[in-house]
A protein has these predicted regions:
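Cytosolic regulatory regions built on CNB/CRP/Popeye-like sensor folds
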Residues: 1-245
Length: 245
């Protein structure tokens, strides 16, 4: 289609030439962490076939200012940014919010309270979610467990840790979590604990999957790639966290 194009990228500067997300089909691009956040320790993350470049930036209309290095020509499928944004805007409110939330996390920005989403979520799923209470310091789920569903924080706060128990994020009222494992069909890769006594709403895994199945292929593509991208960015961040209590 006129919105997608196979391209051969020979120079890293060409990656930033258009308002487009790039899906790698062959080759490797390297991202140094100092291009992402300030750190005195330097590590590099590889992006290869099956990964995307500038997807989060394109979806959120941010500057394409993360600097990649390529040592060999990179084969990509380029997808027009305006087409991607329109597809996501027309997605169901839950899928749209999942994508927006993931972009926020990729940029390591603090989640903001979202009362509009909360109202719509509570109204839309009032007969579907299961309520639960979790006491302070109790686990909500642990690494390796199969996903039960998406969790919405009605009251309280939680914190996330890596498999090595390095704490890396906190989430608060109106935030949600746990959707990544559902979308990527994997077991839990993080631990989540209650930071204080919490009231949670659990939206069953099958309901989330049903929402996703009704979306157009382009939205499904964005969903799978945005979580892959979040995982790659987390690997870059976690390389500085190992062993931190």
């Amino acid at each position: 289609s006129k919105y997608t194009e196979k391209r051969l990228i020979s120079y890293a500067s060409e990656l930033q030439a258009r308002d487009a997300a790039l899906f790698i089909t062959k080759g490797v691009a390297l991202l140094r962490d100092h291009s992402v956040f300030d750190t005195t320790i330097h590590s590099t993350q590889s992006f290869s076939a099956g990964d995307s470049i500038y997807l989060a930036a394109t979806l959120s209309k941010r500057r394409l200012d993360r600097n990649y290095t390529i040592h060999e020509p990179l084969e990509v499928v380029s997808v027009d940014g305006s087409v991607l944004r329109k597809a996501v805007m027309n997605a169901s409110f839950l899928v749209n919010e999942i994508i927006r939330n993931s972009v926020t996390r990729i940029y390591a920005n603090k989640q903001r309270a979202n009362p509009v989403f909360e109202d719509r979520f509570l109204l839309h799923y009032k007969d579907s979610f299961k309520k639960s209470s979790v006491r302070k310091d109790q686990p909500i789920f642990l690494v390796g467990e199969p996903p039960k569903g998406l969790y919405f924080i009605a009251k309280g706060s939680v914190f996330l840790t890596t498999e090595e128990h390095a704490k890396f994020a906190e989430l608060y009222e109106t935030d949600f979590f746990g959707e990544g494992s559902i979308i990527t069909s994997t077991n839990r890769s993080k631990n989540v604990y209650a930071m204080e006594d919490c009231s949670l709403l659990l939206l069953d895994k099958q309901l989330v999957l049903d929402e996703i199945r009704s979306e157009i292929p382009l939205v499904k593509l964005v969903l799978s790639h945005i979580f892959n991208l979040l995982e790659l960015m987390n690997q870059l961040r976690f390389s500085h966290l190992e062993g931190v209590a």
